[in-house]
Amino acid sequence: MCPISTALFVIAAILALIYVFLTWNFSYWKKRGIPTAKSWPFVGSFPSVFTQKRNVVYDIDEIYEQYKNTDSIVGVFQTRIPQLMVTTPEYAHKIYVSDFRSFHDNEMAKFTDSKTDPILANNPFVLTGEAWKERRAEVTPGLSANRVKAAYPVSLRVCKKFVEYIRRQSLMAPAQGLNAKDLCLCYTTEVISDCVLGISAQSFTDNPTPMVGMTKRVFEQSFGFIFYTVVANLWPPITKFYSVSLFAKDVAAFFYDLMQKCIQVRRESPAAQQRDDFLNYMLQLQEKKGLNAAELTSHTMTFLTDGFETTAQVLTHTLLFLARNPKEQMKLREEIGTAELTFEQISELPFTEACIHETLRIFSPVLAARKVVTEPCELTNKNGVSVKLRPGDVVIIPVNALHHDPQYYEEPQSFKPERFLNINGGAKKYRDQGLFFGFGDGPRICPGMRFSLTQIKAALVEIVRNFDIKVNPKTRKDNEIDDTYFMPALKGGVWLDFVERN
């Protein structure tokens, strides 16, 4: 055999071995009598992870649409790893709530190393088992109704500054309008840094602190992290000796340094120690529980990073939908009135809260939940075929698909806040049916939900009271989700015009 033929034979043999390695497990679900979504070598059932032509949630949505009427469970593959997707709200509720013990953890924990990425590793969303349970018990009292109420005057003060900032920016606004996400991120950075740390990020000035820029980078799409999760699925042992951080090193270092300085200032200031805020609560917890500096910093950093981005996204999209729907904007304006609202009054704004919940339905912070099986259990398909799941298996809940299924939500792409009014059962009705997961559900429901809702409502009250919000032509008319960002966001950005009201 000539050298060229030998080389071609070797290459062909190597390619064949790679193909077998990538696809040999694709019969996993078929052998167990479970229907399987179409899968491809290397990319599994979700090719958009690699093509980046659209958000991967649309791959999940298509699988859901294909099987929802015939099957309650369907086999999928994350690269070459078999996973199971549920297609019924009953199973979604079972996994989140009624059988929580069997689906206790989130898949993200598999790809997170506490040494490489201590911020993410200490996030309640990522923590597992008893560590999560202990952390949840520690953090929840720091977000009590009394502490949220104590922070409300700070929120009002920041909201007044926010309105003035929008007013100044509108005077200088180009024809493309204002970037609503940037505006809202300035607000959440300012209000959360003040409420939590007692400092100002100077977000509404011409010379903001570096905190504003770093906040914008917190959840930038990290291709390195995505690629690492793909490799880890192809070859799981890599997680034992190599890991990649979701957060850029300089971003993590900045916030760690900021936290250390804030803690030092707080300890040295008797007056600041009287604030009933999250940082003082954490300092008290440190003394009580003996937390080390790294744990204290990570605890508080988690609250900051989650609050900055998630709250800003929800506020951005709520403003978008109010701008698209002038009648709903007018209803909200009528509800809030003209007088300054107390904490008790802002907590009782049913239509405003319904607008936020409807926004969370359309742009849910978690588009698909990936839960890790923690106790042996069994799921049964519509045809009666059951499959036994073992600890370590992953089950996917297609949150975005359930939120947009016309079987459960009439005209799912339309903004209809009345769905979530208490007279119609409110958000609780949909949660109990396994159809709404805006803040998650069950024991792992977002612990900062009350705080986040208060900050969003406070901002909406001041903005809607002072401006008519209009959609700038630069903003797309549909709800397509961006494929380049870690958090769900409208593709192309949200560009709005704020017209001063008399």
Curated annotation (Swiss-Prot):
This is Probable cytochrome P450 28d1. Heme binds at C446. GO terms for cellular component: endoplasmic reticulum membrane. Its cofactor is heme. May be involved in the metabolism of insect hormones and in the breakdown of synthetic insecticides. It comes from Drosophila melanogaster. Signal peptide: none annotated. The lineage of its organism: Eukaryota, Metazoa, Ecdysozoa, Arthropoda, Hexapoda. It is an enzyme of class 1 (oxidoreductase).
